[in-house]
Amino acid sequence: MAVAELPNIVSTDSSPSPHPGSRLSSEPTDIESQKAPSNAEPKTDPNLVTWDGPDDPANPQNWSFAYRAFVTAIWVYGNLCTCIASSIFSSGSGQIAQRFHVGSTVVTLGISLFLLGYTVGPPVWGPLSERFGRKWPMVIGMALFTIFCIPVAVAKNLQTVLIGRFLTGVFGAAPLSLVGGSLVDMWNPAQRGVAMACCIGTIFGSPVLAPLMGNFIVESYLGWRFTQWLSCIMGGSCTVLVVFGLPETFAGSILRKKAAAIRKAGNPDVHTVYDGKQKGIKDIFVIFLLRPFALLVTEPILLLVTIYQAFIYGILYLVFVSYPIAFREVRGWSLGISALPYIGMMVGILIGCAIVVIQTRRNYDGNKAVVPEQRLPLMIAGGCLLPVGLFIFAWTSNPNIHWAGMVIGSAPVGTGMYMVFVQCLNYLVDVYPTIANSAIGANTFVRSFFGAGFPLFGPFMYHNLGVAWASSTLGFISIAMIPIPVLFYRYGARIRSWSKNSKHT
């Protein structure tokens, strides 16, 4: 939702919020505890540069609601561009296979390599954001994403296509990795719930929306190359919008700029609370590469929740090979018409988004502490909806049965996947507030490999088992996953008490 790094999307508490993404921010987990004090607060250091009182207009939290909504819309659009690019490639897989004389599985690598690029991006964009703020890493990421769409669009061989797809994934991870931190900068905890729900809905729904556009483009005279030009056009327009319309929201960057102006005016001793807190290479290696794997093998909550969420993410990208088989090969629909059933899943995702926002706002008033296990009832509900939808989809897939059954089944699949995915992220952030970057890093790494791997074996599974039994297999596995949130809802507090890394209260 890249789903990439995702944030604590609908949290209305004041606990640290790290990133979709995890797929969404790679900021330090103490981002809120490091909020700069204002000059209205007592301070002992006369050279400490802070906000000019609680109503300082330079503080993004004090911008008008309309302006913050505009800035949020830019971030949403950036994520829309890159997430559409992640899956619109699947629409042209048939033409690409014919053009380069390869099998469809080889072409599917274009999706898998894009998602693998998501695993490389966050360890780069997170530290850059901490050092240089949100805006310029976003500018660099979107500009390079746009540039590397071009070689894919004009490629003369498959190698160029695959390398270009990987690089667009690396640079396309920028908005996914940075958006969570920017929303934390602007919105208070209660407001942030809605803002982040919109972002995660975009990140989760855009890959489903992409084939609706891509299939009709490929079926027209424009062909598969225009799907990549479309990604390039969207990325370029977003780059221009970011350069000229996106303000810096990171308090550290704003206050450092203010301190630099004061130094230039004649006071060389001023500083900010953010000075000297940039992470070195060793810190980055430990936080993003070493500690995540250690946590996976020592933290049962992280391990099991990551497996569950990775399975959900894998199903999301498996859809882009299973739907063409179910509707084009089995039912004989045209390329464009075969994309319309994705609408059912989109509706389900929107329903899931609404449920999560409403229930979270009901549970958290912004003034009371979050109990991590309060996230789990929605995860359990989503986990129950998912196999129901998969079984409906599976056993109405016979071409002699009306197609409406499969579309209806797609809706609970979308709702269930969204609810499980979102609440998995929220639960991990609540359980591991002080090491959320590492926990989400481990989660993202495993999740991205599932997302990259499922489209590779999906065609073999659906061709060998048939649509009914292949989808039913996913349904049975989904049922087997339901005890995970049930276990933690019943015994989560006790399990957390065994860990030195988790929140115990």
Curated annotation (Swiss-Prot):
Gene3D superfamilies: MFS general substrate transporter like domains. This is MFS-type transporter oryN. Pfam families: MFS_1 (PF07690). It comes from the Eukaryota. It is found in: Membrane. It comes from Aspergillus oryzae (strain ATCC 42149 / RIB 40). One of its GO terms (cellular component) is plasma membrane. SUPFAM superfamilies: MFS general substrate transporter (SSF103473). Belongs to the major facilitator superfamily. CAR1 family.
